[in-house]
């Protein structure tokens, strides 16, 4: 499920798809991998 701003949730896990973040698109995020929490 996508909540916008790159945030997705699947069951109890949420993550940020950094490819969807404006900061990533602007080249200010160096790590292309998802940020999990």
From Swiss-Prot:
> Major location, coarse class?
secreted
Q: Does the keyword Disulfide bond apply?
A: yes
The name on file for this protein is: Bacteriocin lactococcin MMFII
What does the UniProt function comment say about this protein? Bacteriocin active against Listeria monocytogenes and Lactococcus cremoris.
Q: Which UniProt keywords apply?
A: Antibiotic, Antimicrobial, Bacteriocin, Disulfide bond, Secreted
Q: Which residues form a coiled coil?
A: none
Give the record's GO CC terms.
extracellular region
One Pfam family name is Bacteriocin_II
S-S pairs: 9-14
Keyword Disulfide bond in record: yes
Tell me where it resides.
Secreted
Sorted alphabetically, the Gene Ontology BP terms of this entry are: defense response to bacterium; killing of cells of another organism
Protein family? Belongs to the bacteriocin class IIA/YGNGV family.
């Amino acid at each position: 499920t996508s909540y916008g701003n790159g945030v997705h949730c699947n069951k109890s896990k949420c993550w940020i798809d950094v490819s969807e973040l404006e900061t990533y698109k602007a080249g200010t995020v160096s790590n292309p991998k998802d940020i999990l929490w």
